[in-house]
Amino acid sequence: MGNSFGCSASGERLVSAARDGDFVEAKMLLDCNPCLAKYSTFGGLNSPLHFAAAKGHNEIVGLLLENGADVNSRNYCGQTALMQACRYGHWEVVQTLLLFRCNVTRADYLAGRTALHFAAVNGHARCIRLVLADFLPSDKLNSLPETGVVTAKNKSEQSALSKFVNKAADGGITALHMAALNGLFDCVQLLLDLEANVSAVTFHYGTSMDMIGAGSTPLHYAACGGNLKCCQILLARGARKMTLNCNGWLPIDIARMWSRHWLEPLLSPNSDVVIPAFPHSNYLSLPLLSILNIAREFGLQSATIGDEVDICAVCLERTCTVAAEGCEHQLCVRCALYLCSSSNVPSVTVGPPGSIPCPLCRHGITAFKRLPSSLTREMKLPMSLGFCAPCMLHTGDTTDQSSPTCPPTEQRSSKTRAASVSSDIFCPVTCSPFPSVNIPMCTCNEGTCPNFETHGTERHSEEHVESSPSRTTTEQEKIEEGQRLGKTTTCSSMFWGRRSCSRENQCNSEINA
C-alpha cells in the first residue's frame, strides 16, 4: 500500500533519479528492487517513467521499461509517458516507447487528447512521424499523388490512419486545428500528407474558442493564427474560403477580428492571388515501420557471427543487420532506425515521396529487410537507444535475464508483438468526464500569447472598472480590452477550464518541480 500511495522512500529516490537523469542511482535502486519501476507518486500518480519521458532521459526510460514499468501507465490526468514525451518533443523517448509497443491511441481524461494532439500543438513533427508510423506501412502504399493524400491498397489500413489523424479532442478540435492555430507549417504539411481532413469542423457544442466559434475549419484557425504559409497550403489542399462557422463568420472575418490584415488578399472571396504548389513534407518516412518492426522483434543488439561479418559503415561499431531494399546497402539496426526517425531531407531529390536517402549512395529507401545470418530471435528484448555511446553499466548478456519478482507469464506477454490497430476502436466524439468550457487559444509560435479569460473573470474585471466612476466609457472599454488580451498563457492551457486546468497543474507541478 505504501508503494501505491507514494509512501516509499526508495520510490521517491527513483522518482528523483528519473527526473534528474541520474542513471547510476536509478540502476542501483532497480537492481535492489525491480518493482520500484511500477511506483507512482501520491498526488499526481506520476510514475518514474512519466518523469523520465517528460525530461527526455532516454536511457532511464529504457531501463525502467526493461525492469517491468508499464509503458501505458496513466497519471491522475490520464496521460501516459508517450504524451509527456510528445508534449516536450523528445522524439528519441517516443521511439523507445514505440519499441516497447506503447498504445498510441489512448486519450487523456481532461480533453480527450492523444499523443498526436500533444505533438501537434507544440510543433514536434518528428514525434508526429513516429506516432503515426504504425499506421503507414511502406509495403501497403502506392506512391504519393500530387495532391499529397496517401493512397493505401488496404482500405482498412487507410481508414485506421484517417480516423486516428482526424481523431477529435474535446470540442471537435483535431491535431490539424492545433497546428494551424499556432502557425506550425511543418506539422500542418505533414498532417495533410497523412490524410488529415482539411474540412474538419469543430463540434456545434462543447468547447470552442469564443473568438473563432464552433463549426470552424482548420482554415478558420489558421486565419486566427496568422501564418500565411499555413493558409496557403490549406487552400492548396482543398480548404474553402466560403465556409461559414456557427457564428456566420468566414475565415477572412476571423483574420480581420484578430488584425491579421496580411491575410486579407489571400482569404478574400474574390481574391485572384495565385496559391503556390507545395511539395510533400520532408518528415514523411516510408521505411520507418519496417525498421521499427525489425527492432521490436529482434532488438537493437547485433549478433556477432565469426570474423567475416561486415561492420556498419555509419557507426563503425556494430555489425550490419539490415539491408535497404533497392540499393541493398547494409546498416546496423540502430543506425537505420536513427536515420528513419531523424531525417528531414526533401524526398524529391532522392526518390519517391517519403523515401529516406541512403547515407552511402543517396538512393531513396522505402523499406528495410533484415539479414537472416545476423539477427537471432533470442534477442527480442528491446534495449534503450543510446546512439552516442554504449551504456557503461551494462554487463553480461541480458537476453536471458528475468526479474525475480515477475512471473514467467508476464515476461512472455511483454515480449509478444502488439496486434494490429483496428479501425473500429476510434470514436468520433470524445468522452470526457469533465464539462466543456471556453477554450483559451494560443496564437503564438514562441513564449507567451494572448488569452481569453472565463466569464467569471470578466465579470470580476467589469465590477472593478465600474467602481471608478471618474473613468469614461471609452476608457472603460480600453481597460476591458487590455485585461482581456493582456493576460498571457502558454500553449499547454488550450483545452480546459479552471477545474481541469487545476488537475493538469497538479500532475505537471510534480514533473517540473
From Swiss-Prot:
Any Pfam family matching the protein: Ank_2
| Gene Ontology biological process | protein ubiquitination
What keyword terms does UniProt attach to this protein? ANK repeat, Metal-binding, Repeat, Transferase, Ubl conjugation pathway, Zinc, Zinc-finger
Q: Which GO terms describe its molecular function?
A: ubiquitin-protein transferase activity; zinc ion binding
Q: Which InterPro entries match?
A: Ankyrin_rpt, Ankyrin_rpt-contain_sf, RING_XB3-like, Znf_RING, Znf_RING/FYVE/PHD, Znf_RING_CS
- The ANK repeats are found at 44-73, 77-106, 111-140, 171-200, 214-244
Pathway assigned in UniProt: Protein modification; protein ubiquitination
* Physiological role: Possesses E3 ubiquitin-protein ligase activity when associated with the E2 enzyme UBC8 in vitro.
Name the reaction it catalyses: S-ubiquitinyl-[E2 ubiquitin-conjugating enzyme]-L-cysteine + [acceptor protein]-L-lysine = [E2 ubiquitin-conjugating enzyme]-L-cysteine + N(6)-ubiquitinyl-[acceptor protein]-L-lysine
Zinc fingers typed RING-type, residue spans = 312-362
> Would you tell me the protein name for this molecule?
E3 ubiquitin-protein ligase XBAT33
Annotated region described as Disordered, given as residue ranges: 397-417, 455-483
Which intervals carry biased composition (Basic and acidic residues)?
455-466, 474-483
- The EC category is transferase
EC number(s): the record gives 2.3.2.27
